Amino acid sequence: MSMEIHVFFSGLPPLPLAVTKAMEQLGLDFAISDPDSGFELGGFMPMTNGSGMGAIETGTEVYLGSAKEMIDALGIEGIDPKLEHEISFRWGSDFMEGACAIALSVAIAKLTNGVIWEDSSGEVLSIENAVEICHEMTAAGKRQ
């Protein structure tokens, strides 16, 4: 079973370097492995947790699409219709991959004033709540 989290936003997706810096500013120890990559192509995005010899190689699946199409497909209500783009992050049972997905979603939401939608709970997550969940998943991933 896979899990998924979405960010609804307007404008262009932020550059990976800006996303990595935002994760750092939020206290999330993740980095996008290829700062020249983009979100437009989709697929697996390699990342690291930590740095140096103790860095953990990980990542998550990334898909970019239309906010309206995703909102309609999921039957979500209450999302501002001015938010035109959607980026989703998908992972399986690996907690560290889930932590990557949440770290990316928090950073992108912060950079774009976007809205984080968590599929399994069917609710909007605040930046603060998502950061807390990311820390919990990171700790669980290190024990996995």
For each of these PLM feature ranges, what is it?
Residues 1-144:
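Acidic (Asp/Glu-rich) sequence patches and key acidic residues
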